[in-house]
Amino acid sequence: MIVFSALVPSSPFLFPSIGQSATDKLKATLQAYQELSAHLYAAQPDIIVVVSSYKTVEASTFFINQSPHYTGHVKEFGDLEFSFRRKGAIGFAHHWKESLARTSPVQLHTKQDLHPTISIPAEILTKPLPRVKIIPVEVADVSSDLHYQFGKEKNNAFASAQQRVAVCVLGTLSQKLSPDSPAGFSLAAKTYDTFMMSH
């Protein structure tokens, strides 16, 4: 059954040792994270599915990570002490993949080392739950219809599961607000940001 769901921003600056200079700007976000962490703890999930737009491979396939263990470091940001460690849920990941195989482009892979954009939010949210198992998922470069289908089938699989499942989607606001943006400019960017912040 699904016992918790959240859409949260993902940034290395959320971690105190990295984002010290931005702490004031991130105060509301960090407070919201702590509130979500408390709600997540109260839900007592067995498994947390972490859906991220970060990709280890550019592909038109959803990747479900079924590593037995996960680790995460932020050495590239100057913090040599931080170490994220959680167990995976291999059986659940495999069963979930099989239930999706006929309707969605999905594959299993095994990646133990997690990118900071995944490990840092996961660390903040699951700090009170050090024994909880996680399943990272990489979204695919596919149509919105296929994303909807994947989400619908995911919901059906989790709702009928005996395990208590939490779903955390990691995302960002638009990076196309300015003509000077490396990602380019989009007239829809502001509308997208407004919609996301209001929900």
Question: What do the PLM-derived regions correspond to, one by one?
Answer:
Residues 1-166, 170-199:
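Soluble secreted/lumenal catalytic domains
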